[in-house]
Regions:
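Short, acidic/turn-prone active-site loops that include or flank metal/cofactor-
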Residues: 68, 204-205, 227-230
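N-terminal positively charged helical leader segments and presequences
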Residues: 1-69, 120
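Non-catalytic positions within long, well-ordered alpha-helices that form the structural scaffold/packing
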Residues: 28, 98-101, 216
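RNA substrate-binding interface of SAM-dependent RNA methyltransferases
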Residues: 71-173
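Short acidic/polar active-site loop segments enriched in Thr and Asp
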Residues: 33, 103, 221
């Protein structure tokens, strides 16, 4: 099986192109040579056969072959908005959420967030997490890379959400341990096939009561994953699996 690489450039059968710097570095690290076959995808759908034609000191040229309209994506659009877990656990969550099939991720600051980011540091983290998502797609066979959005405060992000409509139905689920909360599996039973899902998950310790109330006022409904208290990243990934495999 040929090694897979993401390249954010236009592609056409028979074209010769120079790989973007980040992709070229990846090819060079693997010590690949001219004549070797690789697979390229650009996030626009499907993937391309390609052959390395030249290896420079810092650049790599390839010739594109056939396009394969293969898609390994799930049919439903699912967004995950979450209070960021600490340190490397966010990297792991982005990687696994991408492998499962999330469409977009929204990192959030909440009242109980341990990880706090702003300015240049926030931008660097966003770019890093986007790179983690790219690498996960290269590994798992996905041809559409999920978007990792800039870090936002929860309240500010909630204000940006568009209203759901009959043409674009959205189920907005707040992961909660509050008494009387309906199981997520029940909320998904009658979900139309064309409906998107947006999950809001808190950091360690969950969202505060005030934050949950703010989310509910913005159209979210509380759902539970069961009686056990799951780690922040475990809860988020469990919800994704249930929504994408109902």
């Amino acid at each position: 099986m040929a090694a897979r690489f993401f390249a954010d450039v236009p592609m056409a059968a028979g074209a010769t192109l120079s790989l973007p710097d980040s992709t070229a570095r990846h090819v060079q690290v693997l010590r690949m040579q001219p004549g070797q076959s690789i697979t390229l995808f650009n996030g626009q759908g499907g993937e391309w056969d390609a052959s390395i034609t030249r290896m420079g000191r810092s650049d790599v040229d390839v010739c594109l072959g056939a396009h394969h309209a293969s898609e390994r994506e799930v049919g439903r659009s699912v967004q995950l908005a979450l209070g960021m877990p600490a340190n490397e656990r966010m990297d792991w969550l982005v990687e696994k959420a991408t492998e499962i099939g999330v469409n977009s991720l929204q990192p959030l600051h909440t009242s109980r967030s341990v990880l706090r980011l702003s300015g240049e540091r926030a931008e660097k983290k966003q770019n890093h997490w986007q790179s983690v998502a790219v690498a996960a797609c290269e590994q798992c066979g996905g041809n559409r890379v999920p978007t990792v959005a800039p870090v936002r405060d929860l309240a500010a992000w909630l204000k940006t959400l568009p209203p759901a409509s009959a043409e674009q139905p959205v189920l907005r689920c707040l992961l909660s341990l509050a008494d009387g909360t309906q199981p997520l599996a029940h909320a998904l039973v009658d979900l139309p096939d064309n409906a998107a899902v947006c999950f809001l998950s808190g950091p360690e310790g969950g969202l505060s009561a005030q934050e949950e109330a703010l989310a509910i006022a913005s159209g979210f409904s509380r759902v539970t994953l069961g009686p056990r208290v799951l780690r922040a990243e475990t809860a988020a990934l469990t919800a994704l699996v249930l929504a994408l495999n109902r």
